[in-house]
């Protein structure tokens, strides 16, 4: 029975739960790695050993957080749980493939761990650039294991993307058009399209790297007519859409949370929100070389990538102001989920502003590979993606479990986390402007103060993570059951009660069209 339910599952709710648990578990591993980084950088001098070990930790931290925490939770967890419920589908289009998508992840995670355990580990950074990732600088199996790990995670995501696209297009009630689906469903659809188009390019790049390392091809070796910059183009053609893949489902969740706790029946500017997400998805594919301003591109090329990157600020601005307009005039309920959403809007905007700074190719020449970049992407990930995940979790926890969280503790948790992440990452802007480079385990004494403060912030965040575990435990032992949910007419996922029955929408939903 246990095996049939959890190992061979074809139920979107159970698979979503597996994704959430796996993502939470990986998130703990990723948090542990980040604390190793901040412990090393807490004061000048060496803590862990050499820079190879440090860079293995940094690389693992990135891969774990991106491929095993954010993506499984947002797309696998919330996506599986909510998309079928929101469109009134009985399950995903391909329920068994759905199960395989999940079960490819634990082996992938094990391969990544194995890569750290053999030889010297993969100290390449998450970008895995050759020649550092070649078989001279990284002899042994570490990088090869990392590449296999990425292959598995990539196959998992591609299959999941196919599944979501098919489900969303094909399994709506006959009367429901695409423009009547909730914004979270749209965000997952667009994310899935991005995954489907970008991951094969990554697969090609890392496969060529694999053959360069093991079969003496020279795709990225100038000695044989190759070019390491080709790898950078292939990697970032995936890598830039990837960062939008990480944030788009968050946009969808924030839209739902802000609408719900403003007491509105719909978000402000639904069509604008949809088109903005589609624009972001499209533009995300034509700006990749802004990660490569320092490799010696033509001035006209740099001018194009600078301006194209700045254009993304327009649809992003549409979304931010639409969220604010949704709040406007609403009967605002200061729930923990609303606090996460408001924190998201503010801090994501700050991260977006530093992104506009970095989009300027002239400035980026100076700021590239400094802590300014680290601060930028951690504002949009550690306070964008993670705040969206936390907001979505406390908002939909009653749906998933049938129990309510302790409101007061959840708010305290938010405050601690808010202080922690800001104290960790705000000082890194100063370090970057002062020229402290990324990916080094030690630094000149001049950088000590801000690094110490940053490391203190990371330990405050750790207390927040520990508190979150306690809050979830408290909810399950107290068993406060959900009595009633507001606004179910415009929030279809709550319609079947908390938690919903194992099978929902076994007969097609009746859709009442009102113009």
Curated annotation (Swiss-Prot):
Pathway: Energy metabolism; oxidative phosphorylation. Fe(II)-heme a binds at residues 61, 378. It is a multi-pass membrane protein. Component of the cytochrome c oxidase (complex IV, CIV), a multisubunit enzyme composed of 14 subunits. The complex is composed of a catalytic core of 3 subunits MT-CO1, MT-CO2 and MT-CO3, encoded in the mitochondrial DNA, and 11 supernumerary subunits COX4I, COX5A, COX5B, COX6A, COX6B, COX6C, COX7A, COX7B, COX7C, COX8 and NDUFA4, which are encoded in the nuclear genome. GO terms for molecular function: cytochrome-c oxidase activity; heme binding; metal ion binding. It is found in: Mitochondrion inner membrane. It holds the Pfam family COX1. Residues 1-11, 87-94, 171-182, 262-269, 328-335, 401-406, 479-515 are mitochondrial matrix. The chain crosses the membrane at residues 12-40, 51-86, 95-117, 141-170, 183-212, 228-261, 270-286, 299-327, 336-357, 371-400, 407-433, 447-478. The keyword Signal does not apply. Its main location: mitochondrion. Na(+) binds at residues 40, 45, 441. It comes from the Eukaryota. Heme a3 binds at residue 376. There is a cross-link at residues 240-244 (1'-histidyl-3'-tyrosine (His-Tyr)). InterPro entries: Cyt_c_oxase-like_su1_dom (IPR023616), Cyt_c_oxase-like_su1_sf (IPR036927), Cyt_C_Oxase_1 (IPR000883), Cyt_c_Oxase_su1_BS (IPR023615), Cyt_c_oxase_su1_dom (IPR033944). PROSITE patterns: COX1, COX1_CUB. This is Cytochrome c oxidase subunit 1. Its cofactor is heme; Cu cation. Keywords: Calcium, Copper, Electron transport, Heme, Iron, Magnesium, Membrane, Metal-binding, Mitochondrion, Mitochondrion inner membrane, Respiratory chain, Sodium, Translocase, Transmembrane, Transmembrane helix, Transport. Mg(2+) binds at residues 368-369. It comes from Hippopotamus amphibius (Hippopotamus).
């Amino acid at each position: 029975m246990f095996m049939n339910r959890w190992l061979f599952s074809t139920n979107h709710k159970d698979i979503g739960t597996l994704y959430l648990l796996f993502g939470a578990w990986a998130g703990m591993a990723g948090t542990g790695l980040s604390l190793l980084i901040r412990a090393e950088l807490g004061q000048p001098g060496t803590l862990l050993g050499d820079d190879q070990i440090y860079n293995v930790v940094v690389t693992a931290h990135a891969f774990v957080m991106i491929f095993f925490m954010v993506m499984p939770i947002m797309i696998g967890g919330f996506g599986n749980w909510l998309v079928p419920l929101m469109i009134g589908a009985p399950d995903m289009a391909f329920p068994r493939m759905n199960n395989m998508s999940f079960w490819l992840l634990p082996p992938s995670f094990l391969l990544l761990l194995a890569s750290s355990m053999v030889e010297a580990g993969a100290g390449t950074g998450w970008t895995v650039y050759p020649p550092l990732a070649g078989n001279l600088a990284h002899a042994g199996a570490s990088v090869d294991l990392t590449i296999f790990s990425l292959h598995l995670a990539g196959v998992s995501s591609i299959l999941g993307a196919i599944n979501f696209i098919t489900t969303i297009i094909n399994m709506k009630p006959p009367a429901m058009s695409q423009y009547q689906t909730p914004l979270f469903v749209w965000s997952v659809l667009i994310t899935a399209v991005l995954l489907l188009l970008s991951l094969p390019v990554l697969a090609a790049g890392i496969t060529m790297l694999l053959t360069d390392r093991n079969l003496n091809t020279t795709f990225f070796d100038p000695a044989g007519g190759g070019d390491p910059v080709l790898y950078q183009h292939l990697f970032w053609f995936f890598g830039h859409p990837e960062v939008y893949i990480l944030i788009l489902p968050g946009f969808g969740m924030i839209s739902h949370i802000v609408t719900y706790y403003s007491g509105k029946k719909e978000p402000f500017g639904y069509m604008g929100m949809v088109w903005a997400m589609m624009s972001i998805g499209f533009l995300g594919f034509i700006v990749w070389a802004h990660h490569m301003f320092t490799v010696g591109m033509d001035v006209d090329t740099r001018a194009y990538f600078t301006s194209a990157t700045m254009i993304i600020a327009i649809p992003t601005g549409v979304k931010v102001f639409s969220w604010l307009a949704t709040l406007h005039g609403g009967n605002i309920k200061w729930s923990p989920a609303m606090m996460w959403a408001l924190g998201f809007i503010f801090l994501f905007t700050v991260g977006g502003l530093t992104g506009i700074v970095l989009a300027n190719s002239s400035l980026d020449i100076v700021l590239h590979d400094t802590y300014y970049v680290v601060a930028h992407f951690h504002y949009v990930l550690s306070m964008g993606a993670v705040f969206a995940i936390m907001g979505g979790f406390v908002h939909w926890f009653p749906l998933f479990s049938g129990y309510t969280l302790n409101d007061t503790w959840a708010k305290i948790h938010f405050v601690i986390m808010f202080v922690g992440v800001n104290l960790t990452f705000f000082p890194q802007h100063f370090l970057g402007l002062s020229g402290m480079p990324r990916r080094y385990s030690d630094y000149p004494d001049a950088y000590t103060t801000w690094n110490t403060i940053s490391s203190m912030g990371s330990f405050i965040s750790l207390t927040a993570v520990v508190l979150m575990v306690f809050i979830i435990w408290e909810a399950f032992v107290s068993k406060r059951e959900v009595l009633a949910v507001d606004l179910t007419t415009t929030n279809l996922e709550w319609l079947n009660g908390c938690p919903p029955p194992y099978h929902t929408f076994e007969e097609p939903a009746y859709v009442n069209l009102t113009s």
